[in-house]
Amino acid sequence: MEELKLLGNRASPFSYRVLWALKHKGVKYEYVEEDLFNMSELLLRCNPIHKQIPVLVHAGKPLPESIIILEYIEDTWPQNPLLPLDPHERTMARFWIKFGEDKAPIFYKFFHTVGEEQVKGTKEAEELLKTIEEYGLGDQEFFGGEELGLTDIAYGWIACWLDVLAEAAGVEMLGPQSFPRLQAWAERFKQLPLIKDNLPDRHKMLTFFKSRREKIIAPAATT
């Protein structure tokens, strides 16, 4: 079997995207935990451009960026497909994945700001959630229909990380009254054995992100 390594971090939703996809495919791999603030020589050598995790190393060849890695996994290991066979449905899945990636910075604005800027950032994130709920998910069980797909994995951080980020920032996000369908999807997603058995400890995540936020907003608090 060709060597397969995943360089990631247990606090990173992007690392978990890759981890979930590999486990869904039943592919064996070696996981290498990376320190986000003291990156290894291996990581810097494998991803010299962005110097970020995750990186998948397959047969000595590194691949950066979680969404690109997901596409590679789908192409390389066709068993248990995560993308639809229908060309239109397949393309729309890719559309919503790209949409989420393009808009991702909006979700982090409320976490990185305070005061009026945080209020504004929270509203912008809620508007984006409405768009995803109405036009991306709709009335489906999952983004691709009745079964887990690549779009669900790409948006999995909303189900498993967004509430942690919101609590760390002292705001409310993804409430069942405001987003009933998206909240229901998030609960279904988290209850899947694949996801449920492969999640970081929530308390540790909350502690980590509270610490990160304090460091991020510290300059704003002193001006």
Please annotate each region the language model reported:
Residues 1-147, 180, 214-217, 222-223:
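GST-like domain detector, emphasizing the conserved glutathione-binding G-site
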Residues 25, 46, 168-172, 193:
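Residues at alpha-helix termini
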Residues 83, 172-176:
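Membrane interface segments of multi-pass transport proteins and intramembrane proteases
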Residues 106-110, 161-169, 195:
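Amphipathic C-terminal alpha-helical segment
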Residues 129, 177-193:
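Short, mixed-charge aromatic SLiMs
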Residues 134-146, 168-169, 192-199:
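Surface-exposed helix-capping loop/turn segments at secondary-structure junctions
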Residues 145-169, 177-183:
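GST superfamily/GST-like fold recognition
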Residues 192-223:
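Long, charge-rich low-complexity segments
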